[in-house]
Structures are given as structure tokens and as C-alpha cells.
Regions:
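Helix-turn-helix DNA-binding segment
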Residues: 793, 817, 859, 863-906, ...
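Sensor-1/coupling segment of RecA-like P-loop NTPase cores
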Residues: 153-187, 192-196
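Tandem amphipathic alpha-helical repeat scaffolds
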Residues: 335, 383-389, 418-430, 454-470, ...
């Protein structure tokens, strides 16, 4: 790159370093921050690198925020996405298109139903789309001037980007906003983060810059003094030289000149030279977030504005481009504003409040122009907070709401308290739970209105639920209900929240009472969405109590579009419906619905909902036997929940991931995850999460042939669930593992009553998964008591139930038990075929520990299987292949991997003495195996 700009003199090495850094392909995402003192040349290097990368066909999204824009929500993010071509936007789902349009203020926020997560996800989607064609550079000049909402979005975006070719280049002033640097480092990881610290320029570079910028050559003694006074800072050196007369240059060797030192003194001296008109223009521009010539003319007498604009442009204070009037350097704007008196600024902001169009900027000018608390100003700020929230600018909404509280007159207590509660809600939404808690705990003791107090207590209960302690959250809900009076909506919201907490704490009867009270209030409200939600909440609790599935509810409430505003994902009607399908063994329907809901959540950028849906999808996939997908979805749900910072919920996502890893036989990983979940669950006293994570540890021990250790972990869980009346057999799926552990320990007398109760409930409810597991456990009990024939019949009955429901792992467990029994009956061929089929399934889905059990049993049979005939799996594969199916088609038909089909074909050819697919087809025809295929 040819560096010829005056501003880049002496900085060629830094520019080359930057460009080399961005040519690296890993790691991604990459973030580089140019750090240095004000005026040291950060922006010049940034501009050069940005221009060069654009020339190298990078997609560049850039913004140059100023300090005056820092109060405007999404101002920087709007600059980043402004100018995107229509094709980029058309690739987004409609909700995300509306989110981008909202950032650009092209749509009414009341019509867009946006969340901050939706805004963030839309931006990520844009970046990902652009990165598919060429690398993307997110370029920000003056990181410290980012508005909070844009900063929130950018950090969130970088967290979501993994392997995409995306990089970030930003500038930041030394000794300021180090927190932002640390947050960037934590987001992209140390390996993808670098800081370029700018050093002072040399004497020669400073001299050449002054010569080329001001067309003067400083005598060497004066150049040395200017260099020392500026500290090698080019901006400061130019400003010092600008203040010296040419006569001073000529006489510099004859007398000592007063050289101004320090930025404030230098800039002050330069601004002192402006006329009154130019000073007024500069002040108006410094107070505006985005100064324009029209606004300056509106704020000042026309003649003053005209003269002043000409002068400030000639003197290099402002750069006028069309209607835009931008300061030549951000330091000039700060200096102009800082020199003005408080009264002067107050009057100016009051005047500007009547001129600007943006609602948020207007209200901030009103606030800055107020002499004392003013209800008109406070009400405007509160309304602006609502508008910002509707745009998804939740951080900006929190800031505006805080300002509204500050500007509310002290005698208007109810208004002040109302706004404090709103502020807490916005802070909680933005992820600042500590700030929300402090605000609520400070406000609640002063609340005289019972309705406000109940609302505040309900919000505090949500804070406790997500971050602290579930029993305490329940107590806060009860306190909120006690004071709710005749406010049905507060009661309804609190009852629904309390229902979920109590069911999670395994107070099922209490949960049912709360759910039924909520349903009654929902009917009284006439709100159809709330009625649907409340009916499904009650149906869920009744299901957990072992009362089965309310078929009327399930047939009437299938609509996937019934979403309730401001409700958490776990009680949204479509999600509740899908979870009930999962728990009641409607696996195919549940999976399809969960996948649709997941896509919808992503389209709207609702990652909290997406994580909850993935948690259930991962659990379901483990039950089905799609273990690799289960791990992928469990891991992703854990990642999102971690970033959301909701501590107690994290224990559930950890469980789902751990469960999948345990079934894959990854002992160390699954144990670590389950113990992590247990630690969180015990801290928050999240009883259900304790049960789930402990159950994973018990399953690991059972998989390792350590039944005594499994029993030690699982037995207390069974007692706990029985005591809580959470007796739905398909809900926790723990009891069959405990029964197997007891039988393996020789404790048949303890296993028998548990099994009888389990079988009775399974039969009563018609729960297929429980009927299959119960039949297997019955067979294990009969085998342990010395009745192998009975055991074999039970195992075959279990397989009949398995055939009604896709549960590859559980079916393979039953085949393993049947194979062991057949071996004990000395039915060698049948035992080998059954064990081989079980092994094939475990190998195909990845159940490593249980596959080892099969291999051990096959090893005990001894001999070779080559003359024992085909296993059932081999027969099905041979039949399909002889019928002309390809290996891939056969694999899809039997839900096997192509590799498994290939290995089975090798064994089939060896057993039958064949060498080709044609010979296999002929063999089937000759031996009339086609009839057997149809029968099977």
C-alpha cells in the first residue's frame, strides 16, 4: 500500500501491521483496537486501513460515533447498517427485516413488536449473510462514543459469531473505557484480540507534518520546542504551530517564545480566535447529536448562522458536506461544549428541544434544559423510554427511565415509583439483574399503592428466580398476591409465575391450585391468548401429577401463533403444547413442532426462547436415540443460556447436554456437566434441576456396570418424586434405571414394589415408553429370579412396545437383555443374532459404553457367527439391497448410517459366500427369502 496522506506520515509501519493482521484467516472473529492519546493519529490509521480493506473487496460496515451521539439508542448501529443493499435485507426473515428498519427509524416501533434480542440477531444475520461472499469488517472510530444500545448489540453479535470471516477494527482513547477493551477481549478470546498502542511521532515526522499541513518550515530550535511541547502528538503539534505567527518563526532564534502546553490550553487558544458568530455556530453544533446546517440556521439568527458557518469551515473547525456539519476533530466538539457555562447550555438545550425531530434526542434536550424537576420533562422521558423499548433499545430505555425518575418532582410519589419500577424492568431485560434488584429493593419499602407494591414484588420474584433463589422467589410471589387486591392482571401474572416455581420445587398440589386460580382470572379477563396459556399451564401440572393428557386441551389448543406478550418462553402456549407432546411420547409431532418453534424464535431473535426449545429438543433427541444432534442442541442451548446470564435456568441446559453425552458414553464430559448443573441447582435450590442432573450421574454409573453406585444416587430421587406426587412415568424416566440397578444388586424385594407401581401407572395412562421399559424391567426381574423363559417373553413383549415408538437406545437395551437371556438358555444362534442387532444399533447411534456390554456378551458366546445365519438387521439390509436399494437408501429406510450398512453387507457376503449385489439378489430369489422380508 502506498501511504501518501499527510496524516499518515510516520505511521506506515502501523498501517502495514494492521493490514497483515487482517489478512490472517484465523482466528475468527478478530478484533483489533487502536489505542492512543487524543490527537495521536488513531483515526487516520483507522481510515487508511478501512479504505485499503474495502479496496481488497472486504464488506465494510463502519461508523464514527461522536460524544454527542452517545445518548441516542442505536445511533452507531444505524450507521453500520445504513446503506445496505436491498439484496442483503431480502435474505432476512420478515421479523428481522423489520428489526433493521426499526434501527434505521423506518417503521413505527409500536407495529414491529421488537425485542433487543431480535435487533441483535438481525444484525448478526446481516453480518453472516455478507460474510458468505467476502470477509466483513466492522469498523468503529471512537469506541468510547458508542451509545449503550449499539455497544450491547455489538458485544452480543461477536459472541454469536464463530467461524465466520468477520473482523472488527476500532479506536479508543488511552486511559478511557478500558472496560470496553476487556469486554471485547473476553468476547472474541485473547487469541482473536489485539491492541495497537500508538507511540509519539519522531521530531522529523512532526516537522514534515507541520510543513505539509501549514506550508511552513519551522526553524530547528522552534521545531524541537514544539515537538517537546506536543509530546510527539501530531494534532497538538499542528495546533501549537497554528497559533504561532510567521513573524514568530523568523525570530525564533532571537528570543524565547511562549509555547502553549496541554490540550485544553491549545484548543482554548484556537477557539478564542473565533468571532462571536463562529463561536455560536460551534456551540450549537457541539450540542447536537448530528448537526446539520438547517438545524444551525433554525437555532440562530440567519445572518449569524451564515457568517458563522463560513468562518468555522474556513478555520477548519467544522467540515460542511451538503447539509451535514461535522467537527474536523472530536476534540474540538468537546472543547467547545466544555467552555460554555451551565446556564448557556441549559438555554441552548431548551431551544434545541423544539427543533430536533428524533423523540429520544428531543427528550434528552428537554432534560438537559430543565432547571429543576419538571413533570412535563419527566413524562416525556418516560414516554421516550417506552418508545426505545418498543424499538428493542432496552439499554437506552433503562437510561431514559432513570432520567425520568430524576426529573419527577418529589411530591409526585406514585409517578416516581411507577417510573422506578419501569426502570428496574428495563435493566432486568438488558441483563443487569443487580441494578434491577437494587432499584426494586430501594423502591418497594416506599410504595403506598398496593397495586404498585404487588407489581414490584412480582418483578423482584423474577429477578430472584433467574439469578438467586427459587424458594425466595416463591415467597415474593406470595407476598405480591397478598397485596394485589382487586388487580386481576397482576394476580394473573404472579399466579402463572408461582405455578411454574412451585412445580419446579415439586410442590405439585400448590402448583395446581395456583394454575387453576390463574385460569379463572384468565377467563374473567376475556383475553383468549391468556386463556389458552392458562389452560395449558394447568394441563401441564395435571400431566405431571399422573392424570394423563387432557385430549380436549390438546385438540383445541394446537395453534402455533398464540404467543403472549411479555411472557417467558417456558409458559408460551406453543412451547407448552410441544413439551406436552414430548412428555406424552408423541415424539414425531413434538420434534416437528419444536423445530418450527425454534426457527420462529430465531427469526424473531428471541434466543431465550430458542435456548428453552433447544433444551427440550436435545432431551427428546436423546430419548429417540439421535445422540449427536442431541449433543449439538444441548451444547447450543447451554451457550445461549450462559450468555443470557440466567443462572438457575442454566442447570436445565447443562442437564440436557450432560444426558446426551452420557448416552454417548463420554463419561468425563457428562460427569463434569452434570456436576456443574448440580452446583448451580443446589445454589438456587432448584429442586427439579437437582433431580435431573443427579439422574444423569446415576445413569452413568449404571452404564459403567456400577449398579450399587447408581442405586445410591437414584434411590433418593425416587423417594423425592413420590413424595411430591410427580408420578407421571414418562416425565423423569428415572425409575427403570433404579429398578435395573436394584435387580443387578440382588435387591429383588425392593425392585418388585417399585416395578409393580410403575407398570400400573404405565397401563393406566397407556404410556408406550413406560410400558416398554416396564416390560424390560419385568424380564430382568424374572431372569434374576431364575425364570429365563418368562424373562424372554417379557423382553419380547417389551420389543413389541418399542416397535410402536422410536427409541433406538432403549430398544437396543432391551435387545441386550434378551440376548443375555437367550445365551443362558443356550440358544446360541438366536442369542448371537439378538446381541449383534443390539450392537449394531449402539454402534450406529454412538452408545459406546452399552456397545461394549454387547461385545462382552458376544465374546462369551465364543466361535464365529459366519455359519449362524443372518441377524435380523442383516436380513433387513440384505432384503432391501437385493430389492435394488442403494446403500444410502437402505440406511435411510432403516435409520442406520451408510457405514453401518456397508459393514453389515461385508458380513452378509461372508456368511452367504457371495461377492456381489447381483449374487445376493439371486440368492434371495432361490431361497425364497422375499416372503420372509414381507412377513418381517
Amino acid at each position: 500500500m502506498q501511504v501518501s496522506s499527510v496524516d499518515l506520515l510516520g505511521r506506515e509501519r502501523e498501517v502495514r501491521w494492521l493490514l497483515d493482521r487482517f489478512e490472517e484467516t484465523t482466528p475468527r472473529p478478530l478484533a483489533v483496537v487502536i489505542r492512543g492519546d487524543p490527537g495521536i493519529g488513531k483515526s487516520s490509521i483507522w481510515q487508511a486501513a478501512v479504505a485499503e480493506l474495502a479496496d481488497r473487496s472486504w464488506n465494510v460496515l463502519k461508523c464514527r460515533p461522536t460524544e454527542s451521539e452517545i445518548q441516542l439508542s442505536f445511533s452507531a448501529l444505524g450507521d453500520l447498517v445504513d446503506g445496505l443493499d436491498a439484496d442483503a435485507l431480502q435474505t432476512l426473515p420478515p421479523p428481522q427485516q423489520r428489526a433493521i428498519e426499526s434501527i434505521l427509524l423506518r417503521v413505527d416501533p409500536e407495529d414491529s413488536l421488537l425485542t433487543w434480542q431480535g435487533i441483535h440477531y438481525a444484525f448478526v444475520s446481516v453480518v453472516r449473510h455478507l460474510s458468505t461472499s467476502k470477509p466483513v469488517l466492522i469498523a468503529i472510530d471512537d469506541l468510547q462514543s458508542l451509545d449503550a444500545s449499539s455497544e450491547h448489540a455489538l458485544v452480543s453479535a461477536l459472541r454469536r459469531l464463530n467461524d465466520e470471516p468477520v473482523a472488527m477494527l476500532a479506536t479508543i482513547r488511552s486511559s478511557r473505557e478500558e472496560k470496553k477493551i476487556l469486554e471485547l477481549a473476553q468476547t472474541v478470546g485473547q487469541s482473536g484480540f489485539a491492541i495497537l498502542d500508538l507511540e509519539p511521532l519522531s521530531l522529523e515526522a512532526i516537522g514534515e507534518i507541520i510543513e505539509r499541513r501549514l506550508d511552513v518550515i519551522l526553524p530547528r530550535p522552534l521545531a524541537v520546542r514544539v515537538w517537546h511541547a506536543s509530546g510527539g502528538n501530531p494534532f497538538l503539534a499542528i495546533e501549537i504551530a497554528r497559533l504561532l505567527d510567521r513573524e514568530d518563526f523568523r525570530s525564533a532564534g532571537e528570543r524565547s517564545l511562549p509555547i502553549p502546553t496541554g490540550l485544553d490550553e491549545v484548543l482554548g487558544a484556537r477557539l478564542d480566535r473565533l468571532s462571536d458568530a463562529a463561536s455560536q455556530v460551534s456551540l450549537v453544533a457541539s450540542a447536537l447529536s448530528r448537526p446539520t446546517t438547517q438545524l444551525i440556521h433554525s437555532a440562530l439568527p440567519s445572518a449569524v448562522a451564515s457568517r458563522g458557518l463560513i468562518e468555522v469551515e474556513e478555520r477548519g473547525i467544522l467540515k460542511v458536506n451538503g447539509t451535514e456539519a461535522r467537527f474536523a476533530h472530536p476534540l474540538l466538539a468537546s472543547a467547545v461544549y466544555a467552555r460554555s457555562s451551565a446556564e448557556q447550555l441549559r438555554q441552548l438545550h431548551s431551544r434545541l428541544a423544539d427543533l430536533v425531530d428524533d423523540v429520544e434526542e428531543r427528550t434528552r434536550h428537554l432534560a438537559l434544559g430543565a432547571k429543576a424537576p419538571d413533570e412535563r420533562v419527566a413524562a416525556s422521558l418516560a414516554q421516550a423510554a417506552t418508545t426505545a423499548y418498543q424499538r428493542g433499545a432496552v439499554v437506552g430505555a433503562a437510561e431514559l427511565s432513570d432520567l425520568a425518575v430524576t426529573h419527577t418532582p418529589p411530591e409526585l410519589k406514585n409517578e416516581s415509583h411507577r417510573r422506578s419500577i419501569d426502570s428496574a424492568v428495563y435493566h432486568l431485560e438488558s441483563g443487569d439483574a443487580d441494578r434491577a434488584r437494587r432499584t426494586l429493593e430501594t423502591t418497594i419499602p416506599h410504595l403506598e399503592s398496593s397495586a404498585l407494591r404487588s407489581e414490584a414484588l412480582n418483578h423482584l420474584a423474577h429477578v430472584q428466580f433467574h439469578d438467586e433463589d427459587w424458594p425466595d422467589s416463591a415467597k415474593l410471589c406470595e407476598a405480591a398476591l397478598a397485596g394485589a387486591g382487586d388487580n386481576p392482571m397482576i394476580k394473573l401474572a404472579t399466579l402463572q409465575h408461582l405455578t411454574q416455581i412451585l412445580s419446579a420445587l415439586q410442590d405439585m398440589r400448590g402448583a395446581l391450585r395456583c394454575g387453576e386460580d390463574a385460569l379463572r382470572l384468565a377467563h374473567e379477563s376475556g383475553n383468549e391468548a391468556l386463556i389458552v396459556q392458562s389452560r395449558l399451564v394447568v394441563a401441564t401440572v395435571e400431566f405431571m401429577l399422573g392424570r394423563g393428557l387432557d385430549e380436549d386441551v390438546m385438540s383445541e389448543l394446537q395453534d402455533e401463533d398464540t404467543w403472549v406478550d411479555m411472557s417467558p418462553a417456558y409458559i408460551q402456549p406453543p412451547v407448552l403444547y410441544a413439551v406436552l407432546l414430548e412428555w406424552s411420547d408423541h415424539f414425531d409431532h413434538a420434534s416437528a413442532r419444536l423445530r418450527r418453534l425454534y426457527k420462529r424464535a430465531l427469526d424473531y431473535g428471541n434466543e431465550t426462547a430458542a435456548a428453552h426449545i433447544l433444551f427440550h429438543l436435545s432431551e427428546l433427541e436423546t430419548w429417540v436415540g439421535d445422540l449427536r444432534s442431541a449433543v449439538r442442541h444441548g451444547k447450543e442451548s447451554h451457550r445461549v443460556a450462559t450468555h443470557a446470564g440466567h443462572v438457575s435456568v442454566l442447570a436445565f441446559h447443562t442437564y440436557a447436554w450432560a444426558l446426551a453425552e452420557a448416552h454417548l458414553g463420554r463419561v468425563d464430559k457428562s460427569r463434569a456437566l452434570a456436576n456443574e448443573g448440580l452446583e448451580v441447582a443446589r445454589k438456587t435450590r432448584a429442586t427439579v434441576a437437582v433431580v435431573l442432573n443427579t439422574a444423569v450421574l446415576g445413569f452413568i454409573e449404571l452404564s459403567l456396570d456400577r449398579p450399587a453406585e447408581a442405586h445410591e444416587l437414584l434411590a433418593p430421587l425416587i423417594e423425592q418424586l413420590t413424595s411430591a406426587e410427580a408420578i407421571e412415568p414418562a416425565l423423569f424416566r428415572i425409575l427403570p434405571n433404579e429398578i435395573e440397578a436394584l435387580i443387578s444388586c440382588g435387591l429383588m424385594d425392593q425392585a418388585e414394589p417399585l416395578l409393580e407401581t410403575f407398570e400400573q401407572r404405565a397401563r393406566k395412562l397407556g404410556r408406550v415408553s413406560a410400558l416398554a421399559a416396564g416390560a424390560r424391567c419385568r424380564g430382568q426381574l424374572e431372569a434374576a429370579r431364575g425364570y429365563p423363559e418368562r424373562a424372554g417373553n417379557d423382553f419380547r413383549r417389551a420389543l413389541e412396545w418399542h416397535d410402536k415408538l422410536t427409541q433406538h437406545f432403549e430398544r437396543a437395551r432391551t435387545l441386550l437383555s434378551l440376548g443375555v437371556t437367550e445365551r443362558r438358555l443356550k440358544r446360541w444362534a438366536s442369542a448371537r443374532a439378538t446381541l449383534q442387532e443390539s450392537l449394531d444399533v449402539f454402534e450406529n447411534i454412538g452408545g459406546a459404553l452399552w456397545a461394549e456390554k454387547d461385545r462382552a456378551q458376544l465374546g462369551r458366546l465364543g466361535g464365529s457367527s459366519s455359519d449362524e445365519g443372518l441377524t435380523p438387521t442383516e436380513q433387513r439390509i440384505a432384503s432391501l439391497v437385493s430389492d435394488g436399494k442403494s446403500n444410502r437408501e437402505t440406511a435411510q429406510a432403516l435409520n442406520l448410517s451408510v457405514k453401518t450398512v456397508e459393514s453389515n453387507l461385508t458380513r452378509i457376503y461372508r456368511k452367504l459366500g457371495l461377492r456381489s449385489r447381483a449374487q445376493l439378489a439371486g440368492h434371495f430369489a432361490k431361497s425364497n427369502l422375499e416372503a420372509q422380508r414381507r412377513t418381517t
